[in-house]
Amino acid sequence: MIFVYNLKMRNLILLFIALFFATSTYSQKIGYEFRTNGKAYISTSYAGFEVRHRTDKEENRFTYRYKMLDSEKFTFSLPLHYKVEKEKATLEPRLKYHLNKFSLWAQKEFNLEENMNAAFGIDIPVNDFTYRIGWDSSDTVRFRLVKKF
């Protein structure tokens, strides 16, 4: 019981730290994602750079996302991730197709030594929020909420 309480408090404290970090660094977005495999992430981003922290482990990732194509109907971006604790860099090309009220996307993560997960999903923007529902090839469903500033 105490362990569960401490875990909830730790996640709440991490959320407040991320909010403080986001507001103090003038971030453009802050997000929270949880997955059916038990993983959860807090992220903040500014001008193509993103910092993501996995809340159930000490795991951090830095990302630079370069948009190669950004049109009214399509966005093709090429994020370069660096996973700090694993000392591993990966690429994760993403293609988004924009419709009137939502966007469909597909992405594939890999590096030179390893073929990693593919993921598919839907982004639904509502005012300053974006809701994401997705699935990846490890049979995990993901849900994400992002607030734009």
Predicted regions: what they are:
Residues 1-31:
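Cleavable N-terminal export/targeting peptides
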Residues 25-63:
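Short glycine/proline- and aromatic-enriched beta-strand/turn motifs that initiate or cap beta-hairpins
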Residues 29-30, 47-51, 69-77, 99-105, ...:
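Repeated loop/turn-to-beta-strand initiation elements of outer-membrane beta-barrel proteins
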Residues 33-37, 52-56, 67, 79-85, ...:
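Outer-membrane beta-barrel pore domains and translocons
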Residues 39-41, 59-65, 90-94, 117-119, ...:
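Membrane-embedded beta-strand positions in outer-membrane beta-barrel channels/transporters
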Residues 42-44, 51-53, 64, 95, ...:
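Membrane-embedded beta-strands that build the outer-membrane beta-barrel scaffold
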Residues 93, 119-128, 137-149:
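Outer-membrane beta-barrel "beta-signal"
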Residues 107, 115-121:
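Acidic, glycine-rich flexible loop segments
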